[in-house]
Design a protein with these regions (language model features):
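Active-site cofactor/cluster-binding pocket
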Residues: 1-256
Length: 257
């Protein structure tokens, strides 16, 4: 069985946080004999300060399933979407994007959006756009964790998110595997305890299709390349041209002007 998690974060300020979460998912999955990969969306590079970016974790039972799931720009049927800043629930406008992508757009039917926030799920839901299917909204009580590109704010947000994911998507990673991965990677029992508490305390509520922000996300219809041909393309000169009245032979192509 294949599962995927996307982590939406603020570029530069939360880059390390996003990568630590997705890497932790894969490390935990390996403890269960599964295979996985953690990667960033290449369209986000180079990241801009505060501009939304994404990191992904894909877990599968074998290499064949994993490779089949990775043959795309970004996973589009995620089990869990993590927003490590609750303002991202208003929608994601990445720097290489044109328009606003709802936070739950790439979350599968019945999947979960997990946000770190000091607000209740009901308050966070007001910012989330409606979805045609039922989904779940989960909240970990926390303020947004911001740091820098080279300096990491080790406030346990990463392990708390990992603990919550074990609760929300046990088919991907179980709590015992998350705890084992934390011990091996960070060797900190306090972080193990933080993950366990997040597993127990994460708030979850079901969301119906008629709940949430009813506004239509704005988008731009950009012209196709062939519609801008006059401004983008200089027609090439034919390699050779036939000569009228000649039987065979040719003359070199030349610019008529």
């Amino acid at each position: 069985m294949t599962g995927s998690v996307e982590v939406v974060y603020r570029g530069i300020f939360q880059k390390s946080l996003g990568s630590r979460i997705t890497r932790g998912i894969v490390l935990a999955a390996v403890k269960e004999g599964k295979v996985g990969i953690s990667f960033g969306r290449y369209g986000d590079s180079p990241e801009r300060n505060g501009i939304p970016a994404k990191s992904f974790a894909v877990v599968a039972d074998n290499e064949e399933e994993l490779q089949a799931h990775l043959a795309r720009y970004e996973p589009s049927n995620n089990d869990v979407t993590v927003a490590v800043d609750d303002t991202l629930c208003k929608g994601v406008e990445s720097w290489a994007w044109y328009g606003l992508q709802p936070i739950n757009k790439l979350t599968r039917s019945g999947g979960t959006v997990l946000a770190t926030s000091m607000q209740s799920p009901e308050e966070v839901l007001k910012d989330c756009h409606r979805k045609d299917a039922e989904w779940n909204l989960a909240v970990i009580k926390a303020i947004p964790s911001f740091s820098g590109l080279w300096v990491y704010k080790d406030d346990h947000t990463d392990v708390r998110v990992l603990g919550a994911i074990a609760r929300l998507a046990p088919h991907m990673v179980k709590l015992e595997s998350v705890e084992a991965a934390i011990r091996e990677e960070w060797g900190d029992e306090l972080k193990v305890a933080s993950a366990r508490k997040a597993y127990e305390r994460v708030e979850v509520r079901k969301v119906r299709p008629d709940e949430g922000n009813s506004e239509k996300p704005y988008e731009f219809q950009l012209p196709k390349w062939w519609e801008m041909k006059e401004g983008l393309v200089i027609p090439g000169i034919p390699v050779q041209q036939e000569v009228e009245g000649w039987d065979g032979g040719y003359r070199p192509g030349r610019n008529p002007t």
